[in-house]
Amino acid sequence: MSGPDHERDGSFERVLAGDPRLEPYRSLRDPDLVRAGEGEGWFIGEQALVLERMLARRGTTISILASGRMAPRAVEIRRASADPAVPILVAEDAVIESLVGFELHRGLLALGRRPEDGRARIDAALADRSRAVALLACEEIRNIDNIGLLFRNAAAFGVAGVLLSPGCHDPLYRKSLRVSIGHALDVPFARLEDLAGDLRAMRERHGLALLGTATDPGAVAIQRLEPPRRLVLLVGSEFPGLSPAAKSACDRLVRIPMARGVDSLNVGVAAAACLSHLRGDLLEAEQPAT
C-alpha cells in the first residue's frame, strides 16, 4: 500500500510544526529537557528496531513521529505490534529537523512512557535463594554508547537487572536506547544512592557474590574462577575503573588476561567477556535440545 493510501485510510495524520503533540520531541535539542523527561516519566526512541521493541510493550508508546518517506514503514511496524492504536504523526523532514536539531536520516521517532523503577522486579528475581541469578552493577558509566552496550550485554547473558550509581547516564536516552537495540526497556534497572553500601546489604540479604572487574595485581583471571550461582558483576568507567569503595565491597576482583602492552578493554567488551564466562554454561544448559 502506498503512502497516500495509508493517509486516506486514516493510518496516520500529517502535522505542522506548531502542533502541541510535537513538543516533547523538541526536547532532543535541550539537555535540560532531556533530563526533565527522565524525571517526568517519558523518553524518546529512534529507528525501527527500537520502535518495534517499544510497541511490543502495550501502553508504552504515546506517539510515533515519522517523515513522509518513512510513514508506510511506521504503519507496518504498528500493525504488527501489540499496540496498534498508537497515533502516527507525519511531518516534513524540515519540521522534524527543526524539532530535534539534527538531520534524522532514518525518519522514525517515538515518544514513550518510562517503565517503573525496576527495583521490585529485581527483588523478585532475587527472592528464591536456590535460583541461579546474575546482576550487573555499573559505577559512574557516563558514556552514552557504553551504557547502551552494557544493557545489550545484560539482555544477551540473561542478567536479571542492572544497578546504576547516581552518575551513570540515562539508559533510556535516545542514543543509549538505540545502542542497546531497545533492550534497556526489557532489562529492569534501578539507581542506588550508595552503590557500595547497598550492594553489601544485598549480598547479605540475598546471598550474592560480588565480583568487581579490575586490572589490579591481585585480581584473579576470570577463566580461573568457578562461576558463583548467584552474583553481581561490578564494572566501572573505562579509565578510572571501580572506586576504592566499590572494590572494598567486592568478594573478589577479576581481570581479563590480555597481551603485553594492553592494559584495558572497552567496558562493554569487558563486561561481555566476563558475563560469557560467568553465565555461559547456564545459558547453554537452557538451550533446547537439537
Regions found by a protein language model. Name each.
Residues R14, F43, E139-E140, S165-P166, ...:
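Glycine- and other small-residue-rich loops at beta-strand/loop junctions that grip anionic moieties
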Residues A80-R106:
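Glycine/small-residue-rich loop that forms an oxyanion/phosphate-binding "nest" at active or ligand-binding sites
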